[in-house]
């Protein structure tokens, strides 16, 4: 019954493709499916196709005969699909099509464990056309790759729905990007979680745009790399990497909405992926952006908090250790002053002796960020004593977990 529910055809004219190691079967008007050969099913015309089942070293090959004349989308409705490639060939290969659209329901898992057979078409999902994960996606798309990009397009990529989880950091001997578009890469409504051994989100020639959704990135190289522009107008973005946001010379950063935290260990914002200083146009930012260059490295669990008076206006936690931070929120103003806390400890910077972070414009950079001597500490669960234990001549303070609180001078007894 569960399989029948997952495989329910969403549109009346859909062709149903059932994947299996014992053989791929096709139901419906198969005029758009030219062939089933072994473990490969070839789609040669635009239209709607439902896909379910489990297969090892199988492939969905989209090869529209004349994509100029037949420019409508090939729409794949992934409904509980599990595909594994041990040969390096893409699980879904958009070799020739006007557009490739994926709508996910249930849990869909795509995995590869070997280097690409053909570098030109490397990727667990690859297309020479636009690739879209549609807003009608209600399920999950999990992609794990040891050596190849998870989603790659020679044109645009749009992630408009669903829960997309990508891990390309499973093989310490190789680097693989998570999501790479030659042209525009856009996220508008999807929840995207990335763990990448190389770059997280990448546009090789154009822009990366995040309009809405939730984006969380942990990258070995650039968390987000854009050639021409990085536009963020909504959503929640946590982007951590050896490098955070990188742009080419004369690139544009435009943050007009959303809550944003980008962190890095190698280079501050304003450097390209090679560590060369570049000119970035930030005039398109309409909400406060704070750039923090710390004097020392901090752990990934150390939250970055900005307060105005006693009110917290920004607080986010990185996905990776960091030295450089770019933070933005609609609650931040380019003309206000704030106090900064890192892991609950008040900070100061080169231009202040009292811990005041005074904004002097929409984007303000602070260098030499370090702990403020004698500054306040925000109590946390670990530093708040909930019990005092008397033993002989000594008193020990413990927290809610029963652990001894090691900093009694900053205890809050409750």
Where in the sequence are the language-model features?
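A composition-driven surface/loop motif
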Residues: 1-414
């Amino acid at each position: 019954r569960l399989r029948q529910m997952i495989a329910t055809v969403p549109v009346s004219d859909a062709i149903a493709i059932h994947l299996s190691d014992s053989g791929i079967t096709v139901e419906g008007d198969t005029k758009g499916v030219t062939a089933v050969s072994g473990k490969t099913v070839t789609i040669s015309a635009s239209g709607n196709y439902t896909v379910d089942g489990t297969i090892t070293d199988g492939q969905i090959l989209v090869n529209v005969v004349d994509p100029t004349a037949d420019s409508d989308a090939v729409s794949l409705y992934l409904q509980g699909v599990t595909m594994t490639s041990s040969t390096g060939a893409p699980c879904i290969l958009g070799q020739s099509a006007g557009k490739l659209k994926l709508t996910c329901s249930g849990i869909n898992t795509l995995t590869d464990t070997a280097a690409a057979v053909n570098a030109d078409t490397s990727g667990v999902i690859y297309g020479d056309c636009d690739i879209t994960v549609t807003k009608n996606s209600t399920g999950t798309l999990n992609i794990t790759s040891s050596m190849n990009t998870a989603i790659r397009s020679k044109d645009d990529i749009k992630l408009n729905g669903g829960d997309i989880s990508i891990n390309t950091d499973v093989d310490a001997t190789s680097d693989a990007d998570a999501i790479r578009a030659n042209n525009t890469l856009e996220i508008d409504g999807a929840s995207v979680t990335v763990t990448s051994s190389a770059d997280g989100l990448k546009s090789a020639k154009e822009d990366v745009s995040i309009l809405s959704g939730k984006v969380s990135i942990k990258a070995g190289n650039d968390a987000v790399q854009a050639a021409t522009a990085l536009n963020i107008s909504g959503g929640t973005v946590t982007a951590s990497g050896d490098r955070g946001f990188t742009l080419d010379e004369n690139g544009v950063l435009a943050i007009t909405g959303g809550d944003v935290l980008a962190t890095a260990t190698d280079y501050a914002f304003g450097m390209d992926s090679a560590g060369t200083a570049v000119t970035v146009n930030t005039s398109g930012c309409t909400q406060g952006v704070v750039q923090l260059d710390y004097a020392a490295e901090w752990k990934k669990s150390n939250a970055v908090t900005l307060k105005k008076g006693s009110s917290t206006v920004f607080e986010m936690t990185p996905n990776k250790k960091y030295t450089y931070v770019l933070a933005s929120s609609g609650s931040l103003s380019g003309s206000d002053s704030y106090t900064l806390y890192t892991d609950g400890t008040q900070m100061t910077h080169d231009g202040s002796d009292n811990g005041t972070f005074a904004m002097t414009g929409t984007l303000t950079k602070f260098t030499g960020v370090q702990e403020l001597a004698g500054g306040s500490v925000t109590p946390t669960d670990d530093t708040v004593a909930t019990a005092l234990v008397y033993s002989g001549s000594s008193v020990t303070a413990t927290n809610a977990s029963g652990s001894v609180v090691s900093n009694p001078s900053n205890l809050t007894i409750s």
